[in-house]
Amino acid sequence: MTPDPQTKIAVTSRSFSRHTELRRELLTRYPNTTFNDAGISLRGDALITFLKGHEKAITALEPLDAALFDAVPELRVVGKYGVGLDMIDIDAMQERGVKLGWTAGVNRRAVAELVLAFALTLIRRLPESLSLVKAGGWQQVTGRQLTGRRVGIIGLGNVGKDLAGLLQAFDCRILAHDIREDKAFCARAGITMVGLEHILAESEVLTIHLPLDQSTGFFVDVVVSKQPPG
């Protein structure tokens, strides 16, 4: 691929800037790239200053709002490093003709594995055992098995579906709740689609995978308030 030295790219993401392989690949294509080598969280005026003079940007957790797009009119393309879009004012981007590059579900396996690790950690009460050992004690802490449990997945999107696949190895009974119903997938994976009240009442392990927006901002509070004791 022919290098493009004319296009100026700003990488605000700290983790991207530290990633040796990603840096190499980007610089091979776009040698005129500025990285966040200071490793600071860029917001407000600092973020605007960093983006000034760049046509494209790769961002992660930095807030991009209408004021920023107005302050940096030369910015025409934003590539999202990660999948959450809650830090970007999509309407403001569209109104100003700024393009967005984003790949849904690119980290689905990483998140699904982490959820599985958390579930095993909590159901086997590993934090309690670790605290006892660190304190110099040794006592049997009886946990439970994940195998055969009723697992509720709220949000059967990219991560939810991948997690369901991993849970099949544990012979879990999987319940799911989503505003969209993928009947073909549920049939193949042995998933039962249920209402919100049902999944909250019946799940022994519950995991939530929803995009953060105005409709889901307080969803965890709702779930906790409706969970049965224990």
Regions found by a protein language model. Give the residues of each.
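Short acidic active-site motifs
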Residues: 43-46, 63-67, 195-198, 220-223
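Rossmann-like dinucleotide/phosphate-binding beta-alpha-beta segment
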Residues: 141-229
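N-terminal glycine-/charge-rich "phosphate-binding" loop or analogous flexible N-terminal tail
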Residues: 1-54
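Phosphate/diphosphate ligand-binding glycine-rich loop within oxidoreductases
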Residues: 36, 55-130, 144
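Short acidic/histidine-rich motifs immediately flanking catalytic phosphotransfer sites
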Residues: 51-56, 73-75, 202-205, 229-230
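Glycine-rich, N-terminal phosphate-binding loop of Rossmann-like dinucleotide-binding domains
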Residues: 13, 61, 82, 208-210
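Short, conserved loop/helix-junction motifs that constitute active-site signature segments
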Residues: 27, 68-74, 225-229
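Short, polar loop motifs at secondary-structure junctions
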Residues: 16-17, 62-63, 178-183
